[in-house]
Design a protein with these regions (language model features):
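Catalytic cores of TIM-barrel enzymes
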Residues: 1-99
């Protein structure tokens, strides 16, 4: 079998096809503190800026080779769409997901 690229490896795995090796990815959020540090971003701020979201999501692939770039920033989209305000915990240095 030829070596697959990251995209094909993940898609073939989901299709139940043979892959050259198991893909290393998470279907859930995978933003890391190392990625945020490298970008100079705070986790809370990433929830409010599309470019920061994309950069944070891509950082895990760029730094660690994970075969995905998942933006875990949609957790409150339904509530926001209905007019609710979210709390991104801007005061915290921890990785706290909005509520």
């Amino acid at each position: 079998m030829t070596t697959l690229n990251s995209r094909d490896r993940v898609l073939k795995m989901f299709a139940g096809e043979e892959v050259d090796r198991p893909p290393c990815f998470s279907g859930m959020g995978n933003v890391t503190t190392e990625g945020l540090k490298a970008l100079g971003q705070k986790f809370a701020a990433t929830h409010l800026d599309a470019k920061m979201m994309a950069a944070a999501a891509a950082s895990t692939y760029k730094l660690f080779g994970f075969e995905c770039a998942v933006a875990p920033f949609d957790l409150c989209i339904e509530a926001e769409a209905m007019g609710c305000e979210i709390n991104v915990y801007a005061h915290s240095e921890d990785l706290l997901y909005p509520t």
